[in-house]
Amino acid sequence: MNWEMVIGLEVHIQLSTKSKLFSTSATKYGQHQNTQAAFLDLGLPGTLPVVNKEAIRKAVIFGLAVDAKISKDSFFARKNYFYPDLPKGYQISQSTNPIVQEGRLDIETSKGLKTIRIERAHLEEDAGKSVHGYIAGETGLDYNRAGTPLLEIVTYPDFRSAEEVVAYLKKLHQLVKHLGICDGNMQEGSFRCDVNLSIRPQGQAKFGTRAELKNINSFRFIDKAIEYEYARQVSVLESGGEVVQETRLYDADANETRSMRAKEDAFDYRYFPDPDLLPLVITDEYIESIKKQMPLKPEEREAVYREHLAEQEVEFLLSNLEIADYYDKVAVVIGYKPAYNWVTVDLISTLNRAEKEFSSDVVPAEILLEIIANVQKDIISQANAKKVIAEYIDAPSAIEAIIEKLGLKQVSDEGMIRELVQGIIAANPQQAADFKAGKTKLMSFFVGQAMKASKGKANPKQVNQIVQEELNK
């Protein structure tokens, strides 16, 4: 019998907010256990939730980016279950009428273009974390993550292969990073995926019994987990057994899925509206204001880059999002191609020599633009701009002060440069004669000597012009 794979996905993205969904606790990753947990996060009596406006804004941005409907009225609900890392005994989530509904994302596979329907995306708070092995023989509980804002993105069961799933996840991962709503760090849990997989005989309309796969933190492992689970379910059914509705854990080391617990249905969670939170009302004016500030989608950004840059340059920017964001700020002022050279050749190469990673904070875009402006005004040379960048990296201060400190201000006095050039020509009569005899490549020799004699301070454009004039006399 031929079996068809049917998959729906639930992707949890951690929204990039400074504070939690309903409390003022910080959301920074990797802090010492339980140092970022407010009374509300710990479920202590007498505490009330206050919704994070930035989380709502980011959810709306996502909805607009996937052409979804934004609910004008949505509600927060309590999802009730008991687990050690859920101190309140319930999770604040959204059940009916979530904030984002009926979106779509187009993917490219070996079989061509396919549209994946997004059923919903809803806001919810993350749970805490059980920590094993930190205390010998005990399980500790770290509530730093409890209350962190999540957007759970749920698709319809539109996937028919592992290839389609991976293509969708990569596209979604790229999208949320480009939108600036999630950092996409899978190792830190910022982008997590649950796979709901069932099989059915080819041509049958009715769905089979699904298993939910958890604990998959890389695209490669997702592909392997799906292929293993598909083969397992085929084996179960073809041997006369029944697939059980359950949650299964993927073990990357053993490359297998193992039963974790019975899979609950929605009614098991006894959802009901959270009495401590008012309905979430989103106006048309609010949606329009966000539309005006929407960043470009990855495909839109790529199209702009391809108009101005070479293939390799486009690929570099698209695969280095922080650099691309920085580059865009420079490009809008000085143009796409010059900006690429300044950011990659001048800035990044200088950072590499200083053994520093790229960060937009090391040399802010406005500082680089100030250095570029000094070159454009002939205050410093292009070559000396790197020295200014290097000094700023080492000891940030006013650019004008750095130029003065390093003595890099260009000499643009025509009389002084001409006298310098005349002296160099007089000191090199043979080379001057060879130039006049047709060896025009010697032009660079005289320019180089003039720049060396001026310690790099002479205006290169003027040096070139004056050398040419003097040699052609």
From Swiss-Prot:
Xref: Pfam families: GatB_N, GatB_Yqey
Q: Work out whether the entry's keyword set contains Cell cycle.
A: no
Q: What terms describe the molecular function in GO for this protein?
A: asparaginyl-tRNA synthase (glutamine-hydrolyzing) activity; ATP binding; glutaminyl-tRNA synthase (glutamine-hydrolyzing) activity
- Indicate whether rRNA-binding appears among the record's keywords: no
Annotated keywords? ATP-binding, Ligase, Nucleotide-binding, Protein biosynthesis
InterPro entries from the entry?
Asn/Gln-tRNA_amidoTrfase_suB/E, Asn/Gln-tRNA_Trfase_suB/E_cat, Asn/Gln_amidotransferase, Asn/Gln_tRNA_amidoTrase-B-like, GatB, GatB_Yqey_C_2, Gln-tRNA_amidoTrfase_suB_CS, Gln_synth/guanido_kin_cat_dom
The record's EC number reads: 6.3.5.-
Q: What does it catalyze?
A: L-glutamyl-tRNA(Gln) + L-glutamine + ATP + H2O = L-glutaminyl-tRNA(Gln) + L-glutamate + ADP + phosphate + H(+); L-aspartyl-tRNA(Asn) + L-glutamine + ATP + H2O = L-asparaginyl-tRNA(Asn) + L-glutamate + ADP + phosphate + 2 H(+)
The protein's enzyme class: ligase
Q: Name one GO biological process term.
A: glutaminyl-tRNAGln biosynthesis via transamidation
Q: Family assignment?
A: Belongs to the GatB/GatE family. GatB subfamily.
Q: What does this protein do?
A: Allows the formation of correctly charged Asn-tRNA(Asn) or Gln-tRNA(Gln) through the transamidation of misacylated Asp-tRNA(Asn) or Glu-tRNA(Gln) in organisms which lack either or both of asparaginyl-tRNA or glutaminyl-tRNA synthetases. The reaction takes place in the presence of glutamine and ATP through an activated phospho-Asp-tRNA(Asn) or phospho-Glu-tRNA(Gln).
Instruction: Describe the subunit structure.
Output: Heterotrimer of A, B and C subunits.
What protein name applies here? Aspartyl/glutamyl-tRNA(Asn/Gln) amidotransferase subunit B
